[in-house]
């Protein structure tokens, strides 16, 4: 979910790769905005009956990268009351330049701001909502090490490994292998588990 509604990328934006059991998607965080999301969650019987609600937060496509942290903070504040956990998605290949947040300097600042805000929200709501970080499978070992150190330093509760890849290794035989977007499914099993 993003602060403001956005329609995502133009259709078609999902392509099945039947020979290799993969999917390429370029959805682009299509959603109705964080306020509509929270209202929908509050109305759901699943939430009302104590179901576990995980919410994935990201930045709007039109938000400049210099203001990306503000989008994450807006979303965290809005979803905190209803979330069982919050995923900080910095790894979608379908939002221009979003993966830049995976570099250690950008990520350090983002995690500092989010964990400081979580501390304030924890006092306000009387609960500490776990924060998860979702990373790309395309990272180099050194980047993974830097991210792991930041996760430990800022006491991030979990790591979601991984989002989709921009690699097209192992799917060259597919008609739609050239489509832009993130590849998921069986073709990235080894990459996401390295």
Which residues fall in each region the model found?
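Active-site-proximal loop/turn and secondary-structure-junction residues that shape catalytic pockets
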Residues: 2-3, 59-61, 92-94, 137-139, ...
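Active-site glycine- and acidic-residue-rich loops that bind
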Residues: 60-72, 99-100, 106, 132-152
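Loop-centered beta-sheet repeat module
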Residues: 70-122, 134
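Hydrophobic faces of well-ordered beta-strands that scaffold small-molecule active sites
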Residues: 1, 25, 53-57, 86-89, ...
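Generic structural signal for well-ordered alpha-helices
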Residues: 34-45, 72-80, 104-115, 144-149, ...
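Glycine/Thr-rich beta-alpha phosphate-binding loop at enzyme active sites
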Residues: 93-106, 150-194
């Amino acid at each position: 979910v993003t602060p403001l509604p956005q329609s995502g990328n133009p259709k078609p934006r999902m392509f099945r790769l039947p020979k290799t059991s993969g999917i390429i998607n370029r959805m682009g965080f299509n959603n109705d905005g964080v306020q509509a999301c929270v209202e929908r969650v509050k109305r759901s019987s699943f939430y009302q009956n104590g179901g576990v609600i995980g919410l994935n937060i990201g930045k709007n496509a039109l938000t400049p990268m210099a203001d990306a942290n503000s989008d994450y903070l807006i979303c965290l504040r809005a979803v905190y009351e209803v979330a069982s956990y919050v995923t900080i998605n910095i790894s979608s290949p379908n939002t221009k330049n979003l993966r830049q947040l995976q570099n250690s300097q950008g990520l350090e600042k983002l995690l500092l701001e989010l964990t400081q805000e979580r501390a304030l929200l924890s006092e306000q709501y009387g609960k500490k909502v776990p924060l998860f970080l979702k990373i790309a499978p395309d990272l180099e070992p050194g980047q993974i090490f830097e991210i792991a150190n930041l996760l430990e330093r800022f006491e991030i509760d979990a790591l979601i490994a991984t989002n989709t890849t921009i690699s097209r290794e192992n799917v060259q035989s597919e008609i739609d292998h050239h489509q832009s977007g993130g590849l998921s499914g069986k073709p990235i099993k080894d990459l996401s588990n390295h």
